């Protein structure tokens, strides 16, 4: 029986990642979780805070700009935050 059968694969992988950090889990269970993650193509670094090692941390510039533009148009945002967003947007162009 597959670990993913009739289940959301992301939830299953998240559970296996949590297993690796749980001090109350046996070494046997941790080894099983490592194998499942490896078989699923998830490069997982136990020393990280739950992030896969394939995540390079780059942000989509379009999304970043969109966030700053939204800040400028949000009436609930302070003038100081809007000024910061404007400076950041000017730097992106």
From Swiss-Prot:
Residues 7-89 are annotated as: 2 X 30 AA approximate repeats. InterPro entries: Conidiation-specific_6 (IPR018824), UPF0654_domain (IPR052670). Keywords: Conidiation, Differentiation, Repeat, Sporulation. Residues 1-93 are annotated as: Disordered. The gene is con-6. Residues 27-37, 77-93 have a biased composition (Basic and acidic residues). It comes from the Eukaryota. It holds the Pfam family Con-6. Belongs to the UPF0654 (con-6) family. It comes from Neurospora crassa (strain ATCC 24698 / 74-OR23-1A / CBS 708.71 / DSM 1257 / FGSC 987). One of its GO terms (cellular component) is cytoplasm. GO terms for biological process: conidium formation; sporulation resulting in formation of a cellular spore. Sequence repeats lie at residues 7-37, 59-89. The lineage of its organism: Eukaryota, Fungi, Dikarya, Ascomycota, Pezizomycotina. May protect dormant spores from desiccation and play a significant role in the formation or survival of microconidia and ascospores. This is Conidiation-specific protein 6.
């Amino acid at each position: 029986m597959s670990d993913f059968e009739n289940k959301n694969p992301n939830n299953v992988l998240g559970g296996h990642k949590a297993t690796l950090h749980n001090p109350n889990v046996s070494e046997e269970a941790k080894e099983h979780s490592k194998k499942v993650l490896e078989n699923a193509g998830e490069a997982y670094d136990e020393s990280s805070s739950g992030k896969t090692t394939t995540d390079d941390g780059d942000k989509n510039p379009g999304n970043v700009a969109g966030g700053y533009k939204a800040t400028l148009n949000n009436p609930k945002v302070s003038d100081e935050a809007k000024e910061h967003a404007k400076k950041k947007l000017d730097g992106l162009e």
